[in-house]
Amino acid sequence: MTEGEVGVGLLDTSVFIARESGGAIADLPERVALSVMTIGELQLGLLNAGDSATRSRRADTLALARTADQIPVSEAVMISLARLVADCRAAGVRRSVKLTDALIAATAEIKV
């Protein structure tokens, strides 16, 4: 990135969860984006909310996430995902690689 160029930060689901929980969040880039997988993860959290207060907080978090640029799952992202998972397996990392996290990482590799 050159001087004066604005970077885009790809936000992971954990950033939204930290904000919802009142956790500390470092300064974010001026422009942010997210994988549509993050929308799915936040929607799942909303659907699994056990009470109305949690449901309300999660609905607010999902609404905030929807204001960011959403990056769709494309063929390039899926190819990157396959390579990332294969590389992890080749390095001996198997069960600890969550496909949702790998998909978000693949999105970051392609788009950011």
UniProtKB/Swiss-Prot annotation:
InterPro entries, A to Z: PIN-like_dom_sf, PIN_dom, Type_II_TA_system_RNase
Cofactor requirements of the protein: Mg(2+)
Q: What is its EC number?
A: 3.1.-.-
Q: Which superkingdom heads the taxonomic lineage of this protein's source?
A: Bacteria
Alphabetized UniProt keyword annotations:
Hydrolase, Magnesium, Metal-binding, Nuclease, Toxin-antitoxin system
The UniProt record gives the binding positions of Mg(2+) as 12, 101
List residues of the PINc domain.
10-109
| GO MF, any single term | metal ion binding
Judged by the first EC level, this protein's enzyme class is: hydrolase
Could you tell me what this protein does? Toxic component of a type II toxin-antitoxin (TA) system. An RNase. The cognate antitoxin is VapB8.
Q: Which family does it belong to?
A: Belongs to the PINc/VapC protein family.
- What this protein is called in its record is Ribonuclease VapC8
Identify the species of origin: Mycobacterium tuberculosis (strain CDC 1551 / Oshkosh)
